[in-house]
Amino acid sequence: MSSSCIEEVSVPDDNWYRIANELLSRAGIAINGSAPADIRVKNPDFFKRVLQEGSLGLGESYMDGWWECDRLDMFFSKVLRAGLENQLPHHFKDTLRIAGARLFNLQSKKRAWIVGKEHYDLGNDLFSRMLDPFMQYSCAYWKDADNLESAQQAKLKMICEKLQLKPGMRVLDIGCGWGGLAHYMASNYDVSVVGVTISAEQQKMAQERCEGLDVTILLQDYRDLNDQFDRIVSVGMFEHVGPKNYDTYFAVVDRNLKPEGIFLLHTIGSKKTDLNVDPWINKYIFPNGCLPSVRQIAQSSEPHFVMEDWHNFGADYDTTLMAWYERFLAAWPEIADNYSERFKRMFTYYLNACAGAFRARDIQLWQVVFSRGVENGLRVAR
């Protein structure tokens, strides 16, 4: 049964409801209220399901049409800003994860290729419509931009300026996605690029996009790389590495970077070190992911590099995600035959929940520039 067929129901006056109502009221959210961030319950078992199953129950019950919210992004932002997780009754703290407080906080899995097949191979029909022409599935830079395309191009330009690219350089792009950055670097800075991805769909599109340029796209694990590059860049890939592999990751970068080279890391980050796994994101979105913390990045990079610059523009990811959501909704009539209504609700939940988390400053977006100690230092672009 679709969610549109399920009418709002009278909420049961039991302990499940009372606990949920008390918690949500602390965030200024009403049950069956009329404000944009209020939730409308369509199944009386909703409260029990969420309190018993936590984040997974919250997300799956939305996918099943058990509850609605006009502005999911506002709902998550309010819940996270209120710090509800820290206000839970003691005996619920291990199981209750209302609002998915760490939506990207996922542990790494041994089989790194899973994420390529589960998420990035969903289909280019979806991503090509939702993303900008450069197919950037990472945070845009909105400082002087007023639309997604210009904001993503501003991000690409800033990356290249931070890397201080010069004609003839060899550049390694770890986690190259659909080849947008590789294409931009090769066509605008006359550099040779090697891109690495674990998604067959991404490799195919990246090769087509970069045809005629000095760009090679490899379908392989980054740990197998053994070459020499003037510059290395990694955008939106470190989230899939996992804490147990952070030391290996920086060792691989060190092994492949020339002595005078520069490395730029672009990653979502956690405001504190936490290895907990969010079961909903782990099951439906990124089966191989975990957000790094400042401490983890510093510890793993310290044996190899000098940290030249740390740039946080996480607030821009909120704007980016809402732009993606707007384009996703606009494109849905064109792609609906390829996906289920439940998939639409899943992706709606994912984009809005993440936007709310960035808006609440619960998660961050960092660009970190490393060298081995460039003489006279680096003047890093903004």
Swiss-Prot record:
Inhibition and activation profile: Inhibited by sinefungin, A9145C and S-adenosyl-L-homocysteine.
Keyword vocabulary terms for this entry: Cytoplasm, Lipid biosynthesis, Lipid metabolism, Methyltransferase, S-adenosyl-L-methionine, Transferase
Binding locations of S-adenosyl-L-methionine: 137-138, 171-179, 197-202
Pathway terms, separated by semicolons: Lipid metabolism; fatty acid biosynthesis
GO annotation (BP), single: lipid biosynthetic process
Result of changing residue 317 to F: Complete loss of catalytic activity
One GO CC term on file: cytosol
Pfam families documented for this protein: CMAS
The enzyme's E.C. designation: 2.1.1.79
Record family assignment: Belongs to the CFA/CMAS family.
Protein name (Swiss-Prot/TrEMBL): Cyclopropane-fatty-acyl-phospholipid synthase
Originating species: Escherichia coli (strain K12)
